[in-house]
Regions:
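N-terminal beta-strand motif that seeds the catalytic metal site of vicinal oxygen chelate
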Residues: 1-23, 86-91
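Vicinal oxygen chelate
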Residues: 1-7, 91, 100-139
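Core segments of cupin and vicinal oxygen chelate
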Residues: 17-57, 61-62, 105
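Short beta-strand
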Residues: 38-41, 87, 113-115
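Exposed loop/turn and edge beta-strand positions of beta-sandwich/beta-sheet ligand-binding modules
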Residues: 43, 85, 119
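Acetyl-CoA-dependent GNAT
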Residues: 61-64, 137-139
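Short, flexible, mixed-charge acidic loops at enzyme active sites
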Residues: 63-77
Length: 139
């Protein structure tokens, strides 16, 4: 049984906790073409990475973010490698060959999938922290 819907309007962002915020930032900016954008003055190191005008990935240094959260009574994720309790995050793109070439030019060798009976082609890769990323292209 389903109750009343929560009035959600969109997915906003996901947070990657890492020991190396610089390497993580470089991966998303170089391999996926995101850019660093505005981030308010928070009490822990990190970046907000944008696709266009949307800040979709937040990156924070693991230890300082965890300490910050604990001080405020915010639940802290367990330190599981990779994606922890979720499997992956997905993005849409427009040109499969262009995306593949860009990834490969940065040393990323993604897995490929074509969804039978559809025009959907997919790429699967991981960031430097083991977070699995899916890129969907409809041809």
């Amino acid at each position: 049984m389903r109750g009343p819907a929560v009035p959600l309007t969109k997915m906003e962002h996901y947070l990657v906790l890492t020991e190396d915020i610089e390497a993580t930032k470089e991966f998303y900016c170089r391999a996926l073409g995101m850019h660093v954008g505005f981030r308010p003055p928070l009490e822990f190191p990190g970046y907000w990475l944008y696709v266009g005008d949307t800040p979709c990935i937040h990156i924070a240094e693991w230890q300082t973010y965890t300490a910050h959260s604990q001080r405020r009574g915010i639940p802290v994720s367990t330190r599981a490698p990779g994606t922890g309790p979720f499997d992956h995050i997905a993005f849409n793109a427009e040109n499969f060959d262009e995306v593949l070439a860009r990834l490969e030019s940065h040393g990323v060798r993604p897995g490929h999938n074509a969804v039978t009976g559809t025009s959907l082609r997919q790429l699967f890769l991981t960031d430097p922290n083991g977070v699995k990323i899916e890129i969907n292209v409809r041809t």
